[in-house]
């Protein structure tokens, strides 16, 4: 059971938005890397748990992972859209 291979498989599943499979692989992945924190952040982002997403993505970004910064930008856009939608009167 290769922990790096599991992390790569989780990332591939996340790119397909397959959160169930990604979670399965993340449970067997190397957890002490910025790439792991980024993947967990993306998992939470896709599931709509923005607080947990921000926590994990910030950890990855603080470790210097550029992709985490891009994912944080995506998270900020989603939060901004939610705020705008909440201001609309239907």
Locate each region found by the language model:
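Short helix-capping/linker turns of helical repeat alpha-solenoids
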Residues: 1, 32-33, 64-65
């Amino acid at each position: 059971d290769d922990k790096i291979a599991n992390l790569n498989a989780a990332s591939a599943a996340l790119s397909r938005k397959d959160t169930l499979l990604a979670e399965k692989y993340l449970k067997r992945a190397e957890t002490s890397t910025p790439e792991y924190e980024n993947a967990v952040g993306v998992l939470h982002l896709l599931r709509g748990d923005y607080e947990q997403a921000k926590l994990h993505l910030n950890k990855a970004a603080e470790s210097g992972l550029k992709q985490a910064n891009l994912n944080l930008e995506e998270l900020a856009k989603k939060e901004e859209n939610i705020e705008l939608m909440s201001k609309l009167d239907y």
